[in-house]
Amino acid sequence: MAAKEVKFGDSARKKMLVGVNVLADAVKATLGPKGRNVVLDKSFGAPTITKDGVSVAKEIELKDKFENMGAQLVKDVASKANDEAGDGTTTATVLAQAIVNEGLKAVAAGMNPMDLKRGIDKATIAIVAELKSLAKPCSDSKAIAQVGTISANSDESIGNIIAEAMNKVGKEGVITVEEGSGLENELSVVEGMQFDRGYLSPYFINKPDTMVAELDNPLLLLVDKKISNIRELLPVLEAVAKSGRPLLIVAEDVEGEALATLVVNNMRGIVKVAAVKAPGFNDRRKAMLQVIAILTGATVISEKVGLSLESATLEHLGKPKALVLNKENTTIMHGAGAQADIEAAVAQIRKQIEETSSDYDREKLQERLAKLAGGVAVIKVGAATEVEMKEKKARVEAALHATRAAVEEGVVPGGGVALVRALQAIEGLKGDNEDQNVGIALLRRAVEAPLRQIVANAGDEPSVVVDKVKQGSGNFGFNAASGVYGDMIEMGILDPAKVTRSALQAASSIGGLMITTEAMVADIVEDKAAPAMPDMGGMGGMGGMM
C-alpha cells in the first residue's frame, strides 16, 4: 500500500479552499445573461466552447491532491444539481463556494463546525419550503418558452422550439435532441408510438417510392419468442386471410422457413403481411411488448402465461388504425387499447420511475411512459460549424431539462431573486445556540451570491443592486440583460422552482460537509527520477581518436 500524506485542521481546510475557489471561479464566469464562455481543450479535435457549468466543472483536475479534493467536492455539487433537475449547476457551484468561504471563516474564528452545519441545515429547510410556496404553476406555452429561453442563455429560438415540441407531444412525451444538417433548428413530430426496429425483409415494402411498408387497418400479432417453424403460424395466418386485413408480426425474431413463407405469401397477395423484431432485449423486450399490447389492445403470445402460437386467435391480435415500417423504425398510429388500461400502466411506470435509483433504468422507463402517454418529437439543432453545433446542442439539452423541471414543480422569479425573497423564511429563525445562529446568518449571506455574480458578470455593482432588490417585494428584481429593474415574471425571467431548490440543497449538503472537515488524506506523489543514460559499452572503435 502506498504511503499517505495527512493534513489536519487549518492547513487541510486552506488547501481544500484553494481547490474550491479555482473550480468555482471558472464555473461562475458563465452565470447569467452576460456570463462568458469557457474554452475546454480536448485531447483530439477542436476545443469545445461552453457556457454550461457542469461541463466546465467536469474538465477541472488540479495537480495538488489536497486542492483537487476541494475541487472534486464542488464538482459533486454541480453533478448532484444536474442529476436531479438537469440545470442549475452554476448556481449550485456559486452557492457552495459562498457557503464554504463564509463557513471556514467562522471555523477559523473558533465556532463549532458541527453547530454551524446544523444552523445551515435548519436555514436550508426553511428556505426550500418558502421556495415551494413562491412557485407558480407553469402550464402555458409562453411560460415554457420563457424558461427554455433563460436556460439556453437568452436564445429565444431554443425556448420557442421546446415550447412547440411540448405542445405537440404533451408534457410526458419524448423529446430528443439531435445534430441537424442545416443552419436552423428544426422540429419533427412522430404521431403515435415508434420503436427502433424496421422490417425484416425489403420484400415487405409496398411503397417503393418511399421505401416503406404501409398497413391500413391492420392486425398486430405480438409473440415473445423466435418463430422459425411456419406450422405454428398457419392457424392465425388462415384466420387473418379470411378477415382480409393486413398483418404485422412483432416477435423476438422471424427466421428461416417462417420468414421465407411470409415473404412468398405477401408477394403473391394471399396475405398482406410484414414482420419486425421486437424492440429491446430480455426483460426490456418483454416490457416493450407489454406496452405495445396495452396501446393496441393486443395480448402477448407467450408460453410462460400458457398461450401457444398455434392457439392464437383474432381475439389476441391488436387493432391499430395504421402501421408504417421503414428500414429502421416501426410507427403505430392510433392504437385501439382501452383508455383505463393505458392510464393504469402509466401510473405503474410513474411509480417505478420514482422508486428506481439507476439513471439508465429511469431513462428507459421515461421512454416507455412517453410511448404510452404521448408522441415523440425530435429537435434537430442547426449551426454553421461543428464547434458551434456542440455548444448549441448542450444549451438545448439544458433548456429541455429546465422546462421539464418547470412543468413538474412550477416557476419562481429568475435572476437570483427567488432566493433573496425566500430569505423572509429565516428572518426570525433561531438555532439552539449561538454557533447555530452563525450558521443561519452565514446561509443568509450565501444565498445572495447568485444574484451578486449575475450582476458582476453584467458589469454592474453587486452591492447596490442587491440592496435595491431587497427593498422591493414580490417579483421585483434586476434584469441583467437590459440593466433595468422591474417585475421578473412580466419580463419573462423565470427559473424552475425545482432547479433553484436542488441547487440550494446540493450546495448546503456538500458545503456543510466541507466545513466540518478536520483531516485530509492523500497519496504521496513521488517525483520519478529521470531515466539513467544507457551504457555506451566503452564506445568501441573510437580508441584511435585520441
From Swiss-Prot:
Subcellular location: Cytoplasm
Enzyme Commission identifier(s): 5.6.1.7
Superkingdom to which the source organism belongs: Bacteria
Catalytic activity: ATP + H2O + a folded polypeptide = ADP + phosphate + an unfolded polypeptide
Database matches in InterPro entries: Chaperonin_Cpn60_CS, Cpn60/GroEL, Cpn60/GroEL/TCP-1, GroEL-like_apical_dom_sf, GROEL-like_equatorial_sf, TCP-1-like_intermed_sf
A single Gene Ontology CC term: cytoplasm
Major localisation: cytoplasm
Amino-acid positions noted as binding ATP in the UniProt annotation, renumbered to this chain: 30-33, 51, 87-91, 415, 479-481, 495
Enzyme class: isomerase
Keywords annotated in UniProt: ATP-binding, Chaperone, Cytoplasm, Isomerase, Nucleotide-binding
Molecular function as annotated in GO: ATP binding; ATP-dependent protein folding chaperone; isomerase activity; unfolded protein binding
GO BP: any one term: protein refolding
Family note: Belongs to the chaperonin (HSP60) family.
Subunit structure, as described in the record: Forms a cylinder of 14 subunits composed of two heptameric rings stacked back-to-back. Interacts with the co-chaperonin GroES.
Free-text function comment from the UniProt entry: Together with its co-chaperonin GroES, plays an essential role in assisting protein folding. The GroEL-GroES system forms a nano-cage that allows encapsulation of the non-native substrate proteins and provides a physical environment optimized to promote and accelerate protein folding.
Protein name: Chaperonin GroEL
Species the sequence originates in: Azotobacter vinelandii
Phylogenetic lineage: Bacteria, Pseudomonadati, Pseudomonadota, Gammaproteobacteria, Pseudomonadales
Encoding gene, per UniProt annotation: groEL
